[in-house]
Amino acid sequence: MTEDAEKRRYWLMKAEGEPRYVKGINVAFTFEMLEEITEDGKMESWSGVRNYEARNMIRDEIKIGDYAFLYCSNCKFPHIKGVMRICSNSHPDDSAWNSNDPYYDPKSTPQNPRWYSVGVQSEYKLDRPVTLRELKMHKENQLKSMELLNRSRLSISRVKPEEWKFIHELSKQPEPEEIIKARLQEEEKVAKRKRKLNLSDGENKAKSPYSSISENDASLDIIKRSRIKDVRSQKDNAL
């Protein structure tokens, strides 16, 4: 083991795994997105942290060469998919100064920054994603002290070396059957909802007087204007 590896600390950093829009901007961030951004050696700024305890970890503890799990939250099956490498020390988070940014904070300024970020790069994917459900299966033994499981609201948490190693070992094993079953059940629920929406949409279109007319058909506009005229006539007659 190299000297850098011996000094390395381990972290878990949360990002939103499914689309969510703030100020019209999608704040989701996945490991695949990180891979694409950093594939040519570029650095991505881990910005948007707006919790003081997590901010302090970024500012005072996280260092170049540390590793972090990228943990996808805000999804049906929160999970760890890959590992990031910290490639810069902390610096003021300039996203807080941009009024158009989802994480804008008017109380943070370049002269008096309130929030900090670090640079990250994708390092490698796990052999398979490890879900929160699976981690919780080991809460009474190997992962009983893991911060993620005991302080779940933190957006950044520390990971002990033995926890880091154990999670990697989990990723090399087949996913537990109960989790596979739960995922399949959820996928079926989603499929049923989609089928129901499609069916409902089809029924509504069938009821529409325009359902058999192309959007480009000039007669469509004539029919619409005719119906508007009919409505106006009915109102006039009522008066």
From Swiss-Prot:
Give the UniProt subcellular location, in the record's own words: Nucleus
Write down the Gene3D superfamilies for this protein, in alphabetical order: ph1033 like domains (3.10.590.10)
The segment annotated Disordered runs over 193-214
GO cellular component, alphabetical, reads:
nucleus
Q: Which InterPro entries match?
A: 5hmC_binding, EVE_domain, PUA-like_sf, THYN1-like_EVE
**Keywords assigned by UniProt?**
Nucleus
| UniProt protein name | Uncharacterized protein C21.03c
Q: Note the superkingdom of the native organism.
A: Eukaryota
